[in-house]
């Protein structure tokens, strides 16, 4: 073992499904509703009175000073559903589940309830993760790759800088090595600016529910560099 952290951590579709169900969408149907308990919130969702991602207030069992107590929390219906699987001994988990947070959550469960119940918990989140990824219908769509409107300006500015560097070299103001380094610097700067623009647009698209962005942000698959190559520019070769 490298650091003692659990290695039985869900991946890919499972992570994506759990991330999706715990994400909050501002203005979703049923936002602001108050429920007496978890069961009430789940019934309201099943009866289509509120959305899976709506922010609601629910009275839940949570750890307060090491003791389980009932208290009202601002959460989402999706998080209530996830907490049906999480052992009550670790309290109410009120956050977005990503691959990173899952590792800590699993470690807490193992510490609190032991291996046997932790295995049941892992089976439960595995099944829920797969089911929610299926229900969400998340896939890689061409329309999910958002090309930033600033792309033409950013690339154009970079090309102008490179042209100036080449002109300086041809006039003998800089050496060949300096020319090479300055061209690399110019395109690296363009690439970084484009990546920032791509991620800004992806984060804001569909209130953060862009399928490709969710795959990236959850840790299920992909990286910012890969998305930037698809929506921005291929980059330096």
Give the location of each predicted region:
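Gly/Pro-rich turn-and-neighbor structural signature
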Residues: 177-231
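Feature marking long nucleic-acid-engaging regions of large polymerase/nuclease enzymes
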Residues: 1-176, 226-236
């Amino acid at each position: 073992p490298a650091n003692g952290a659990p290695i039985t951590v869900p991946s890919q579709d499972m992570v994506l499904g759990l991330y999706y169900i715990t994400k909050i969408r501002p203005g979703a149907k049923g936002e602001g509703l108050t429920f007496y308990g978890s069961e009430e919130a789940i019934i309201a969702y099943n009866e289509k009175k509120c959305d899976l991602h709506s922010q609601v207030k629910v009275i839940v069992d949570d750890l307060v000073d090491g003791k389980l107590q009932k208290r009202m929390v601002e959460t989402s219906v999706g998080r209530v559903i996830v907490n049906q699987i999480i052992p009550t001994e670790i309290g109410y988990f009120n956050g977005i589940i990503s691959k990173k947070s899952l590792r800590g959550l699993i470690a807490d469960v193992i510490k609190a309830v032991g291996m046997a119940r932790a295995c049941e918990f892992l089976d439960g989140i595995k099944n829920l993760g797969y089911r929610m990824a299926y229900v969400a219908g998340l896939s890689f769509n061409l329309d999910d790759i958002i090309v930033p409107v600033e792309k033409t300006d950013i690339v154009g500015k970079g090309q102008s800088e490179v042209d100036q560097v080449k002109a300086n070299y041809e006039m003998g103001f800089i050496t060949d090595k300096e020319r090479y380094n300055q061209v690399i610097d110019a395109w690296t700067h363009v690439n970084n600016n484009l990546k920032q623009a791509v991620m800004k647009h992806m984060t804001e698209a569909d209130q953060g529910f862009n399928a490709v962005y969710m795959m990236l942000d959850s840790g299920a698959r992909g990286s910012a560099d890969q998305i930037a190559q698809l929506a921005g520019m291929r980059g330096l070769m």
